[in-house]
Design a protein with these regions (language model features):
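Intrinsically disordered, low-complexity segments enriched in Ser/Pro/Gly/Ala and basic residues
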Residues: 6, 17-18, 337
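Disulfide-stabilized, aromatic/cysteine-rich ligand-recognition loop
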Residues: 14-60, 64-71, 75-89, 93-126, ...
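Membrane-interfacial loop-to-helix junctions in multi-pass inner-membrane proteins
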Residues: 57, 139-147, 179-189
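Functional-site microenvironments in short loops/helix caps that host divalent-cation chemistry
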Residues: 151, 155-157, 161, 165-185, ...
Length: 458
């Protein structure tokens, strides 16, 4: 990023930390420094009152969240790997998310904002001091690169969460010191219709030898996928508005039993953050501003139940996660009748994301038109499968065969069964973390996250 005084450009850091080749400790430390600078940018304009915010099930108090990110880094790098004593005597009781119930985080005796910033700086300073630290965990056998990546990606996830928390709480959009892409429309030749994928057997999950992947995708395995057709673009605001106009939120036949119960309890009659003016025009809330609904921009803040209901209305369905990954990462044979054995890390190939092929890293500060960024197309012609908006799949979040929890045992296993898989990342996801095989997961009722969807033919 710009204006941080770092010796490497952000694109260089993305390449190094997403490469199949292990980044050096110095490169990982620099990435940790950049990630911490971004975390601080995301909260630097907020008051003490705003940093605590209201008690809501779907967000954390941001003063707790940034302290937790620093504590996590300290726990795994300095304490677990380095064998050092805790910096804060009471830190585990404040910041260990496995021990501290969500609802209690507003009531904790948290350090002040200034003290929290000081703690964050102290942790990072010690992490940057590479002396007197073991290069490998003698118990698990994981090397320091694993724990550096774990802390890095964990903080990046919380940076994305802080961003959608600002949207939830109607705060101004964050002030981030990097070059923005400007016009979110980014006009390009319009595309529509489906891409046909011939199906076949392929390896689901990451098998490219990356230095780090989370435990829920560490067991790549062969699966059989039947031929299918998938939309070349995500569902747009205009398409979702047509569903609303046709009574989609009132017509029981489009909703699953669980979805209808959610809709009634939430009193939902249109997508979240939408508001209709007296003249019938739709507006949507973009952080603390109301803007006209953009027809060709990807629809976001849609939960799984809403996506499923839209599909039923449209005579479509959500893709499975295997279908989504095949459409994003596989290549058709020369005659189009099968897939090859070549699997790409990203839809466009194996090179790391850039602003020319993916809307990531806050550069557009929101979703862009679904026709934009043709350089990011998959081999089958699907656009924006990386970045812009997370995409719901029909698949429940479950363990891959042979699953073994990683050192951070609470990351995946507690959430198997009642969450749904999302793929692709969003505009606030870090380029260095996302790949086609990356699995995200949320409960199907979540509308606050930057999630949309694309559809498949029945």
């Amino acid at each position: 990023m710009d204006d941080l005084g770092l010796s490497l450009r952000e694109d260089d850091l993305n390449m190094m930390t997403s490469s199949r080749y292990s980044a050096t400790t110095a490169q990982l430390i620099e990435a940790l420094q950049e990630a911490r600078a971004r975390t601080l940018e995301l909260v630097s304009d907020l008051s003490d009152e705003q940093l605590m915010g209201p008690r809501l099930r779907i967000v954390n108090p941001m003063r707790w969240e940034i302290g937790h990110a620093a504590w996590f880094q300290e726990f795994w790098i300095l304490r677990h790997l380095g064998g050092l004593a805790p910096i804060l005597a009471q830190g585990d009781g404040l910041y260990d998310s496995a021990r501290v119930a969500h609802d209690s985080r507003w009531d904790l005796p948290l350090p002040s904002t200034a003290q929290t910033f000081a703690y964050m700086n102290q942790v990072l300073d010690r992490v940057c001091d590479t002396s007197d630290r073991r290069a490998r965990d003698p118990i698990t056998g994981y090397d320091e690169s694993y724990f550096f990546h774990l802390a890095l990606f964990h903080e990046q996830m919380h940076a994305e969460a802080i961003t959608y928390t600002r949207q939830t709480l109607c705060y101004p959009r964050p002030r981030i010191g990097l070059r923005q892409t400007g016009d979110r429309r980014l006009p390009a030749e319009s595309i529509s219709g489906d891409a046909h994928v011939p199906g076949g057997r392929f390896i689901l999950g990451d098998s490219s030898g990356l230095a780090f992947v989370f435990d829920n995708e560490q067991q790549p395995h062969e699966v059989e996928v039947a031929p299918f057709s998938i939309s070349k673009t995500a569902v747009t605001n205009r398409e979702l508005a047509n569903f609303v106009a046709d009574g989609g939120y009132e017509r029981r036949e489009f909703w699953s039993d669980e979805g209808w119960e959610w809709k009634r309890n939430a009193a939902a009659d249109h997508p979240m953050y939408w508001r209709r003016e007296s003249n019938g025009r739709w507006l949507r809330r973009d952080f603390n501003e109301w803007v006209a609904l953009e027809d060709r921009v990807a629809a976001i803040h849609v939960n799984w139940y809403e996506a499923d209901a839209y599909c039923r209305w449209a005579g479509r369905r959500l893709p499975t996660e295997a279908e989504w990954e095949m459409a994003a990462s596989c290549e058709p044979s020369s005659d189009g009748g099968s897939i090859t054995n070549n699997k790409r890390r990203y839809p466009w190939g194996n090179n790391s994301p850039t602003p020319a092929n993916a809307n990531l890293d806050w550069r557009a500060m929101g979703c862009i038109e679904v026709d934009a960024l043709p350089e990011g197309d998959s081999a089958f012609g699907c656009r924006q499968m990386i970045g812009n908006s997370w995409e719901w799949t029909s698949t429940a979040f479950e363990a891959y065969p042979g699953f073994v929890p990683g050192p951070y045992k609470e990351y995946s296993a507690p959430w198997f069964g009642d969450h749904k898989v999302l793929r692709g990342g969003c505009w606030a996801t870090r380029a260095r973390m996302i790949r086609s095989a990356y699995r995200n997961f949320y409960t199907p009722d979540r509308r606050d996250v930057w999630a949309g969807f694309r559809t498949c033919a029945l």
